[in-house]
From Swiss-Prot:
InterPro entries: GyrA, GyrA/parC_rep, Gyrase/topoIV_suA_C, Topo_IIA-like_dom_sf, Topo_IIA_A/C_ab, Topo_IIA_A_a_sf, Topo_IIA_dom_A, Type_II_DNA_Topoisomerases. It is found in: Cytoplasm. It holds the Pfam family DNA_gyraseA_C. This is DNA gyrase subunit A. One of its GO terms (cellular component) is DNA topoisomerase type II (double strand cut, ATP-hydrolyzing) complex. The active site is at Y127. The lineage of its organism: Bacteria, Thermotogati, Synergistota, Synergistia, Synergistales. Heterotetramer, composed of two GyrA and two GyrB chains. In the heterotetramer, GyrA contains the active site tyrosine that forms a transient covalent intermediate with DNA, while GyrB binds cofactors and catalyzes ATP hydrolysis. The keyword Manganese does not apply. The keyword Phosphoprotein does not apply. CDD domains: TOP4c. The gene is gyrA. It comes from Aminobacterium colombiense (strain DSM 12261 / ALA-1).
Length: 817
């Protein structure tokens, strides 16, 4: 008999295809593991078993200032009420929350043997005891004030919190790790002080103004409980931007000189999650196998004072060479693969650092809002009662007479409501009032309580009605957590050794860096461009795809930073040698080297060293100008930092470095120029928008700005190859905000001005066209003409080609301008 799919057999058995049943069952299992076991909630940073353990400990009254209780009691409470799984899994989770080498900020205070960094297991749960740390109690603070949602436990006999209020950002400060089905999470721990600083920055900053560089400035990277070192910042930047990255960790070591010329390598901190015993065994095996040479002895001198592994080195062996072998062949140097995967509304998602911080802030906003609403309702209810009691005291004789004249309590209650206009709640409170409340002192207490309640109600209403006030409450609580529990960073972040070694291996040479309009970055050796006479056509300098054009060019050296200023008012730093060298190719996309945001592009490149300069002067296309102290550009990385707030549609046109007492010449595309003193522009902070620098005509825009200097000229170059030098003396000093004077006589033949550069007699200029042709010219080839002159042909162009940009090379110091 042929059976139909899904129809019961004999009223009990439903036939289903085996493949379909396995598929659905496995998917159900996978989702159960993902949501209910392996991944943390992005709000409180806890997996379900961790959350249930903490809540069970709170219910047992295991506060930080109470007596310890047996771990078996905690495990039994958790398993019996909320987590019906193996007791060993629950105990192992609680043990980890008590280990100061596993958690940056342990939540559970364990007494007894809770394991060691050597990999020793914890004692059985019947021997150990536990209670909550004070910082662990913050995870549960205000849970009794309707701050979070609740759900039924496994047998629907009790309610359990679906998320804890979490006054501290646990996901970031303690991290998380877990393997689900088809996905895994591995979030590193961070320093509480730095995380709170980053959260406060987000609270104080408008969302559209938030900058990943500012977050990195306050929160430079993970802080592991075992200390050690982090090599390089690239992995951190990748993890913060995308949710994935690879961080290189290294143990902390130093070299000691002993008696009789002995030398020792001493390891005092090891990478996070590295087993000390396994590390020692690995070192010993490598020494035995002769893959690590020069080691005479190895011993573990760790005690209660701290970790100490001593490696005695042969007298004729360089200890630094042995150290490099240890980094290469043992876990003394390890990697931490960051996967910031957490649950949001029950769905797993990889999160950037900004998303993780915002999720916590939004959670705290919800918690504080619900807590305030709870307190408001409670205060209003109590104020209503106290108002009734005060009113009753005002007419106490009538109240007493009514009560004495009533046959029953219900009759008295009805009389108070109907005759004296009390509410039911007030009437009940009056009937329950003791006679001692009739004294004058008690009346004063009631009036004081009412005044305090009304003040509290007003404050609660302000918090609920004003998001800024709500955020200020959150910020105040975070700063208090930071004050009470913050401590110094344990893990030091240093520059990657590979960066130093690469720079040592690469000879320093002057290079031309080219960025195309499609975002391709490349470099060539400056010596490849031979000096040509005025009117030369140049040589092919860069291979570009059809319709791609050169956007920017700068001269720097392989060892120097090149500063990239973006359309969104940020500056990023990149070493010259990092840029790929190519004689004819397009290069590599700039996004492979620097962290550009969506829709952001580089508008200015500056390769000149900043030695001796004090300020950076910015001018935008629309003529807005700003002066910034150069100290604001220290410690730049490819993550970048915001240096100027911009109006919508505006971009940075030029940046020059100044001494603090310089004259500036601002030039526009339509041939206007304004000379002004930099003191007209007071120094501003990184996010300030600046002030008007020059007044522009219709459709005009700023193309350049230079520092006026003795023995130098402004060199102007038009899009059709015309150029000239003009004396600075022809431009009188004026106040900022003016429209300036004519600087070049323009026509259809010359085209608009593409740039203005300050040059000296011995300088050279490297110009590049929109089709990628380059020419290197001596500045002396450019004539010195009046400011109203048209100039002469500096570069002959093919039909349809135009000058894109240029860079000036100083023959004295090799620096660009």
């Amino acid at each position: 008999m042929e059976e139909k799919k899904g129809e019961p057999l004999f009223g009990k058995v439903v036939p289903l295809p085996l493949v379909e049943e396995i598929k659905h069952s496995y998917l159900d299992y996978a989702m159960s593991v993902i949501v209910g076991r392996a991944l943390p909630d992005a709000r409180d940073g806890l997996k379900p078993v961790q959350r249930r353990i903490l809540y069970a400990m709170m219910e047992l009254g295991l506060r930080h200032n109470t007596a310890y209780k047996k771990s078996a009691r905690v495990v039994g409470e958790t398993m019996g009420k909320y987590h019906p799984h193996g007791d060993s899994a629950i105990y192992d989770t609680m043990v980890r929350m008590a280990q100061d080498f596993s958690m940056r900020y342990p939540l559970v205070d364990g007494q007894g043997n809770f394991g060691s960094i050597d990999g020793d297991p914890a004692a059985a749960m019947r021997y150990t005891e536990a209670r909550l740390y004070e910082i662990g109690e913050l995870m549960l603070a205000d849970i009794d004030q309707d701050t979070v949602d609740w759900g039924p436990n496994f047998d629907e006999s009790l309610q359990e919190p679906l998320c804890l209020p979490a006054m501290l950002p646990n996901l970031l400060i303690n991290g998380s790790s877990g393997i689900a089905v088809g996905m895994a999470t591995n979030i590193p721990p961070h320093n509480l002080v730095e995380v709170v600083d980053a959260l406060c920055y987000l609270i104080d900053t408008e969302p559209e103004q938030v900058d990943i560089g500012e977050i990195l400035f306050r929160m430079p990277g993970p802080d592991f409980p075992t200390g050690g070192l982090i090599l390089g910042r690239d992995g951190i930047i990748d993890a913060y931007r995308t949710g994935r990255g690879k961080i290189t960790m290294r143990g902390r070591t130093h070299i000691e000189e002993g008696k009789r010329g002995k030398t020792f390598i001493v390891i005092t901190e090891i990478p996070y999650m590295v087993n000390k015993t396994n590390l020692i065994e690995t070192i010993a095996k490598n020494v035995q196998d002769k893959t690590i040479d020069g080691v005479m002895d190895l011993r573990d001198e760790s005690d209660r004072e701290g970790l100490r592994i001593v490696i005695e080195v042969n007298r004729d062996t360089d200890p630094n060479l042995v150290l490099r072998q240890l980094y290469r062949r043992t876990q003394l140097q390890s990697t931490f693969g960051v996967i910031n995967l957490a649950l949001i509304d029950g769905y797993p998602k990889e999160l950037s650092i900004e998303e993780m911080l915002n999720i916590f802030l939004n959670h705290r906003r919800s918690v504080v809002r619900r807590r305030t609403q709870f307190r408001l309702e409670k205060a209003e209810a109590r104020a209503h009662i106290v108002e009734g009691l005060v009113k009753a005291l005002d007419i106490i004789d009538e109240v007493i007479a009514l009560i004495r004249g009533s046959a029953t309590t219900e009759e008295a209650k009805e009389g108070l409501i109907s005759k004296l206009d009390f509410s039911e709640a007030q009437a009940q409170a009056i009937l329950e009032m003791r006679l001692q409340r009739l004294t004058g002192l008690e009346r004063e207490k009631l009036e004081a309580e009412l005044a305090q309640l009304l003040s509290d109600i007003e404050r609660y209403q302000t918090i609920l009605g004003n998001p800024k006030v709500l955020d200020s409450v959150i910020k105040e609580e975070l700063l208090e957590v930071k004050r009470r529990f913050g401590n110094e960073r344990k893990t030091e972040i240093i520059d990657a050794v590979e960066d130093v070694s690469i720079e040592d291996l690469i000879p320093e040479s002057d290079i031309v860096v080219v960025l195309s309009r499609d975002g391709y970055l490349r470099r060539k050796d400056l010596q490849e461009y031979t000096l040509q006479g005025r009117g030369g056509k140049g040589r092919k300098g860069t291979a570009l795809q059809e319709e791609d054009e050169v956007a920017l060019v700068a001269v720097t050296s392989t060892h120097r930073d090149i500063y990239l200023f973006t359309s969104k008012g940020r500056v990023l730093a990149l070493k010259g040698y990092v840029i790929p060298e190519s004689k004819t190719g397009r290069g590599k996309l700039i996004n492979r080297f620097v962290a550009l945001e969506e829709g952001e592009r580089v508008v200015t490149m500056h390769g000149r060293a900043v030695d001796g300069a004090k300020y950076a002067f910015f001018i935008t296309l629309r003529g807005t100008a700003k002066r910034l102290d150069l100290s604001e550009l220290e410690n730049l990385t490819r993550a970048g930092r915001r240096v100027m707030g911009l109006d919508e549609g505006d971009e940075i046109s030029q940046i020059v470095l100044t001494s603090g007492d310089d004259h500036l010449l601002i030039v526009t595309a339509q041939g206007q120029a304004l000379r002004t003193h930099e003191s007209e522009f007071r120094p501003m902070g990184r996010t300030a928008r600046g002030v008007r620098g020059i007044r522009l005509r219709k459709n005009d825009y700023v193309i350049g700005c230079d520092v006026v200097a003795n023995g130098r000229w402004p060199l102007l170059l038009s899009e059709n190859g015309f150029g000239k030098r003009t004396k600075y003396d022809e431009f009188s000093l004026r106040h900022r905000g003016g429209s300036g004077v004519i600087v070049m006589n323009l026509s259809d033949r010359t085209g608009l001005i593409v740039g203005c550069w300050s040059v000296a007699e011995g300088d050279e200029i490297v110009a590049i066209t929109s089709r990628g042709r380059m020419i290197r010219l001596a500045v002396s080839e450019s004539p010195v003409l009046g400011r109203t002159a048209m100039g002469s042909i500096m570069m002959r162009l093919d039909e349809g080609d135009t000058v894109a940009t240029a860079s000036v090379v100083s023959t004295e110091d090799g620096e660009d301008d």
